[in-house]
Amino acid sequence: SFQAGLSWECVLNKRKDFEKAYDNFDINKICSYDTTKIKELLSNKKIIRNKLKINASVNNSKIFKKIQSEYGSFGEYLKTFTNGKIIYEIEKTTSKLSDDISKDLKRRGMKFVGSTIIYSYLQAIGVIYSHEKDCFMYLENNKCTNI
């Protein structure tokens, strides 16, 4: 969610500092952040100090945990949108899938989870496979459903 309105490079360059500031991204710890911890994050010059995004990160972690509890895992939640299939798409930044997931997460109360951010997340975890067939990263035996 920190990427909203910023370049990916800006966020990725701060990844190690975010990881340290956010307790190695331990979801259980992030869920319990209080006003003292939020003030600490807001004063940390090594991360993005946007109050709305910091508050959203704590809020979103709580909703993420609820989804895990409801579905058994966040992966199982995502499978309700994909039927467990890997999707091959190139030259896109959003799709109906990312639109639908974004809308559902927003309905549940998450913030800064627009379709472009969700699409990038789905690419990062391998749900959307975006390597062109002549790319050195393209896998001959991939499990994409629409190549």
Task: Name every feature range the model reports, one short phrase each.
Residues 1-147:
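HhH-family (HhH-GPD) DNA N-glycosylase catalytic core used in base-excision repair
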